[in-house]
Amino acid sequence: MRVKHKPWAKDRLEEFPAIYIKNPEDFKGRWQEVFGNNNPIHIEIGSGKGQFISGMAKANPEINYIGIEMIESVLVSALDKAIEADVPNLRLVARDAKLLEECFEKGEIAQIYLNFSDPWPKKRHTKRRLTNPTFLTIYERLLPKAGEIHFKTDNRSLFEYSLVAFSEYNMLLTFVSLDLHNSDYEGNIKTEYEEKFSAKGFPIYRLEAKFDRN
């Protein structure tokens, strides 16, 4: 999807330092200071326009959330939703997922959300998929032993690829749904994409997984 460039996005984000963290590397290992508490930290990689992460922060005040989106012109929409939600447990960061280890210490993140990530369908772009083993290695370092990855997509090919990638990485699949909205799963908070695709009748695929470190 092509994103309309918003030249004013960076300045707009920087107007709200209580929400937008301009230099997340400065807080590596010190994110508890940012939030002012010791609550667990959950991150969403590729948070887009922010509907999911804002909804999660509002529904779970006992958890700290960080929405990560590399495109500032998109992240500025997430900022607007964060302002509207008016929650103290949400921060936003503009960074590429490849740089996460520069922003977070080992084991500092309790849970990772991957929602409707770019499927990168061409074979030569496989390594760009956020469920590629290269990224799984990064996630494994960021998560504690009990940490989990929650993944949602409407793209069956990406879901099947991810199931295989997680399994070959010796991860434990603790939840798998091939049609989330017609399952017994409760507490689902939809993303903008999720609302769009489910309204057209597409099934939503979801899984939960954790690293097997026994």
Swiss-Prot record:
EC number: 2.1.1.33
Keywords of this entry: Methyltransferase, S-adenosyl-L-methionine, Transferase, tRNA processing
SUPFAM superfamilies: S-adenosyl-L-methionine-dependent methyltransferases
Pathway, per record: tRNA modification; N(7)-methylguanine-tRNA biosynthesis
Role summary: Catalyzes the formation of N(7)-methylguanine at position 46 (m7G46) in tRNA.
Binding-site positions, substrate: 122, 154, 191-194
Organism name: Listeria welshimeri serovar 6b (strain ATCC 35897 / DSM 20650 / CCUG 15529 / CIP 8149 / NCTC 11857 / SLCC 5334 / V8)
PROSITE patterns xref list: SAM_MT_TRMB (PS51625)
Keyword Nucleotide-binding: no
Name of the protein: tRNA (guanine-N(7)-)-methyltransferase
Gene Ontology CC terms, in alphabetical order: tRNA methyltransferase complex
Active site: 118
Binding site for S-adenosyl-L-methionine: 44, 69, 96, 118
Keyword S-adenosyl-L-methionine: yes
Family: Belongs to the class I-like SAM-binding methyltransferase superfamily. TrmB family.
One example GO MF annotation: tRNA (guanine(46)-N7)-methyltransferase activity
Catalytic activity: guanosine(46) in tRNA + S-adenosyl-L-methionine = N(7)-methylguanosine(46) in tRNA + S-adenosyl-L-homocysteine
Gene expressing this chain: trmB
